[in-house]
Amino acid sequence: MAARLCCQLDPARDVLCLRPVGAESRGRPLPGPLGALPPASPPIVPSDHGAHLSLRGLPVCAFSSAGPCALRFTSARRMETTVNAHWNLPKVLHKRTLGLSAMSTTDLEAYFKDCVFTEWEELGEEFRLKVFVLGGCRHKLVCSPAPCNFFTSA
């Protein structure tokens, strides 16, 4: 499955949801098993998590028909450590992670396209590609090292 997601702001929960644009694969796929880990708590989304899909580094909720929880997608090349993470983020997105301001859906779409989608399509599989949770997601990440605590610290 190619990285084709659309940003949808859920005003009721004040979170950004990323939903698959279509079920068809486009562009270069990311091979390998999903290898989903069981959630730490009872799932808050339906169990149809799309285990047949082959994206690595995604939480279980990423393939739910209800849509994934609020996520930020980035590559390890752009964020080598959690210490310098804010230097690689647009200022408004950094503020959004700290709850200081909202970022428009258009700005977020541009950020995702520039930082992630182009990279996936041009370079293909990126072994060090990781997914970090902005907040509100209780699902474990697949193939992820130690949890990122940058977004929960002030």
Swiss-Prot record:
Q: Which GO terms describe its cellular component?
A: host cell mitochondrion; host cell nucleus
Q: What is its main location?
A: host cell
The entry's keywords: Activation of host NF-kappa-B by virus, Activator, Apoptosis, Host cytoplasm, Host G2/M cell cycle arrest by virus, Host mitochondrion, Host nucleus, Host-virus interaction, Modulation of host cell cycle by virus, Transcription, Transcription regulation
Segments of this protein annotated with the region Mitochondrial targeting sequence:
68-117
Location within or outside the cell: Host cytoplasm; Host nucleus; Host mitochondrion
Check the record and name the HAMAP family matching this protein: HBV_X (MF_04074)
Q: Which family does it belong to?
A: Belongs to the orthohepadnavirus protein X family.
Q: How does it assemble?
A: May form homodimer. May interact with host CEBPA, CFLAR, CREB1, DDB1, E4F1, HBXIP, HSPD1/HSP60, NFKBIA, POLR2E and SMAD4. Interacts with host SMC5-SMC6 complex and induces its degradation. Interacts with host TRPC4AP; leading to prevent ubiquitination of TRPC4AP. Interacts with host PLSCR1; this interaction promotes ubiquitination and degradation of HBx and impairs HBx-mediated cell proliferation.
Q: What does this protein do?
A: Multifunctional protein that plays a role in silencing host antiviral defenses and promoting viral transcription. Does not seem to be essential for HBV infection. May be directly involved in development of cirrhosis and liver cancer (hepatocellular carcinoma). Most of cytosolic activities involve modulation of cytosolic calcium. The effect on apoptosis is controversial depending on the cell types in which the studies have been conducted. May induce apoptosis by localizing in mitochondria and causing loss of mitochondrial membrane potential.
Indicate what this protein is called per its UniProt record.
Protein X
Encoding gene per record:
X
